[in-house]
Amino acid sequence: MSHISVLLFETVESLLADRTTGVYIDATFGRGGHTHLLLSKLDENARVYAFDKDPQALEVAAALAQEDPRFTIIHASFADIKEKMQEIGVQSVDGIMADLGVSSPQLDQAERGFSFMQDGPLDMRMDNSKGLTAAEWLLEVEEEDLANIIYQYGEERHSRRIARAIKQAGKLDTTAQLAEIVKTAHPKWEKHKHPATRTFQAIRIAINKELDDIEVFLPQAVDLLKPKGRLSVISFHSLEDRLIKQFIQKESTLTEDSGWGMPQQQVDTRRLKKISRVRVSEEEVKANPRSRSAWLRVAERLEQKGA
């Protein structure tokens, strides 16, 4: 299955807010769907920078950079967005978008080791040039820690039973082996959902530090935004969406300050204004079933504190 960009038009339109020029960042280039559309709507003076650490995504991005001088790809995690932009002399931008989902090519290529539907080496690394593979990580992790990770990151109620079965199995080399162990250990299957879905998600999140990276990325993104600059982020599961929701809520809410012996006063430290929350349409889900859980949250940088 080729990669289909989710919430494509909604994301780019929310990011631009009727502008046709400026400096923008695609924090998760993937296969470039959002970036291509963004570039098509910008004038010749605009600049678009993109981040990715997936080798195949970087190949696609390098080809685009050859075609379009307005575009630059940066081989790095979006968790390093502020440092990397400052290294190239960019202190502020007009908009930042991020699509937090795993791309279809990553899921569909068995050799990447993300999918329980196809047999392949048990890898799951976004950047397969460094770090532990899922197979190596599963050998090292303690059973209790694994159970907690499957419960927390996979929201899997049967995490302890599954973790015990995985650790008892010893060395695992393929996704099919792991999927079979989870399937056997799982006492009850959800309708239309493979029993290994939540466990694979949890392991992928853990070895790629996905939620940690999101927590680091969000405040840096706001630091980089110019006044009225937009932040548009697509999430695909409740853990991601909750982080984004809580961050935007915190950055758009007055805080209480109670000085010693003094009545509480509201202090305006707001940096963001909520713009919208958009759910993927039924039509898009029919065309691309993998988009079914997608949400887009959009916020705008305030001009100044209390603006």
From Swiss-Prot:
Q: What class of enzyme is it?
A: transferase
Molecular function GO terms recorded: rRNA (cytosine-N4-)-methyltransferase activity
Could you give one GO CC term from the UniProt record? cytoplasm
Which keywords appear in this protein's UniProt record, sorted alphabetically? Cytoplasm, Methyltransferase, rRNA processing, S-adenosyl-L-methionine, Transferase
Task: Tell me, in one coarse class, where this protein mainly resides.
Answer: cytoplasm
Localization of this protein:
Cytoplasm
The record's CDD domains line, in alphabetical order, gives:
AdoMet_MTases (cd02440)
Cite the NCBIfam families for this sequence.
Answer: 16S rRNA (cytosine(1402)-N(4))-methyltransferase RsmH
Know the name of this protein?
A: Ribosomal RNA small subunit methyltransferase H
